Amino acid sequence: MEPLDNTSLEESQFRPEKKEKSTCSICREDGDGYHFGAEACRACAAFFRRSVSLDKTYLCRGNNDCEITANIRCMCRSCRFAKCLEVGMNPAGVQQRRDTIGKREIKPDSTDLMQLLGSVGDGYPPTTSAQSALVEDLHPSFNDRMPILMKMRVNYRKMDNARLVIHRKDGQSLFKEKTPKAVNYKEACAQSIREVSLVADWVAWCFDDFVTLPMDQKKVLFRNFYTPFSVLEGAFLCHINDTSNALILPSGDYIDTNNLKSFFNIPDEEQPMTDDEIEKFCRMFKPSFELNRRGLVLPMMAEKIDVFEFFALCTFVFWDFGLDEQTDDCMMIGKSVKDRVMKELAFYLRCAKRLEEPSLRVASLLTLLPALQRCVRRFQEDIEITNVFNVYAPPKDFYDLVNGKFC
């Protein structure tokens, strides 16, 4: 046997190995390195860049599960773009086209209500337009895979802008910034009653399946939804505005939970109790506000719940089942809607939030629902107490509203 040549051994040890060619994670063609956060070929990288920069919206003619491989001559663009997102391509990495002309002033052609609401929203940010990543909009490229949640976001902004109009007092300018103030219980009741038609419209704008239901089933769902939604939304508004010592209302006003005496004080009216009795009354209701803070507001803050996760929770609350007078067809439709939203939520958590374990996040979200039920029951019990003893009792229409006895 011939001795091993040490020189040849050294050369073999330090000779660079032949690099394996990468594969495009979208179409399985030969890769061209990392583009926008994922291994991709030049064709898929160019397709993604063009789709994002031009705000393209694609529609799948199948079931959103088309095969995406390089040997298919005409790949489904909708599924191809969805695959780009699923493998980790980030739309934020695409440099948007520059406007070489510069910003141009756009003059309104008319002064209809929708344009008026839009301009109000620009002048005074609505409640969910706080400067927070929790309420940021997604790139339009996500529209195809999250149609319901994206529709809820667009229509929630419309509702938010409309709130700026309906909660204005007579004589107040629509274009002057409204300063939030602490309200008393009569003002809070009146604001909640004004909210009913807006929330009903929002539900109809968001869910096409709701519009097709018989009127009696619409009433069953909405009666069951309004009070839990009000409690859930109030907690979310506190969360995104980073406050836990007040209860923020959709109007932007708030209940000062550290000074409940002012909540039960009605200026220019004779008080039904002495100051000492009011103090005892406040101590009796303080635990209810604390339950809301500890059960909903603080957990939302800890989990950093964002606006799309909030919409998913709203969907689960609205399409409840086993309700009095609810039909089997209504329950089946509700299950179908919730299944679709759950798929959209899973896609959002995986592709937009980049979570490795979306199921754990979903589980954390769902733990808020039992706490919501406890807060709603406590609120209804408090309203019942004030009604029975006729002390700071709310008007009948608000009492019926809270207990689902309206419409």
Swiss-Prot record:
Name of the protein: Nuclear hormone receptor family member nhr-86
Domain notes: Ligand-binding domain exhibits affinity for phenazine 1-carboxamide (PCN) and xenobiotic immunostimulant R24.
Gene Ontology terms for molecular function: DNA-binding transcription factor activity; RNA polymerase II cis-regulatory region sequence-specific DNA binding; zinc ion binding
Coiled coil segments of this chain: none
Entry keyword annotation includes Transmembrane: no
Recorded name of the encoding gene: nhr-86
Subcellular compartments: Nucleus
Species for this entry: Caenorhabditis elegans
InterPro entries: HNF4-like_DBD, NHR-like_dom_sf, Nucl_hrmn_rcpt_lig-bd, Znf_hrmn_rcpt, Znf_NHR/GATA
Protein function: Nuclear receptor which acts as a transcription activator. Binds small molecule ligands, such as phenazine 1-carboxamide (PCN), a pathogen-derived metabolite, leading to modulation of innate immune responses against virulent pathogens. On exposure to exogenous PCN, P.aeruginosa and other xenobiotic immunostimulant such as R24, activates immune response genes, including irg-4, irg-5, mul-1, drd-50, cyp-35C1 and ugt-30, probably via direct interaction with their promoters, and independent of the p38 MAPK pmk-1 pathway.
